[in-house]
């Protein structure tokens, strides 16, 4: 039995996002990142609903960049199980639901849940010194901005593939340094290479060194830019209440 959901708009945000865990838990990653979107896409098509599917910058290899951010026309080439299963999810959505928005985002953080910003703040408090890779570059994205742009996009009925990230490009080291500065935590952040990090953490999955995204289609469709990642991060800290989430 299926309810009539014509003009409903389910948003598939669920994912197995533990990049390292995906390398050893293939079935779990496939179920969450590929089969889940497929099942929802089939249900949406059957009931006449539209569908938003949130995907990732990790569908790209990041091996050949030339310093240019990747737009929606760039051909994916994932180098991890996480990226591969997320790309499969995209393909299923394209195949089974013709009224879809696939929205790739990157380096997402929020007031709630586990994310890089909270990890760096907590690690800085605990250890006082951090090593963060400086040769992997992308776009930090505030979840508030992602939600806002998805809402703006959905009223257009311009279905297809979109990139939605914070404006500006930085390395994980740059991101971590700004997090520590804005948080006021007394900690030092030192840069390291991906190879140096891998030597200390051999179980870690490969990650793209250049996964910067260009929001070209979003700009042309919605008509506005996402906030610069530094401005969005500063706003996050201005309204963050630690374990309580967002300030009232």
Task: Give residue ranges: language-model regions.
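NAD(P)H-binding glycine-rich loop region in Rossmannoid oxidoreductase-like domains
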Residues: 4, 8-32
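C-terminal amphipathic/interface module of NAD(P)-dependent oxidoreductases
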Residues: 206-248
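NAD(P)-dependent short-chain dehydrogenase/reductase
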Residues: 91-138, 143-145, 151
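Residue-level signal for the nucleotide or nucleotide-sugar donor/cofactor binding architecture
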Residues: 24, 32, 80, 138-141, ...
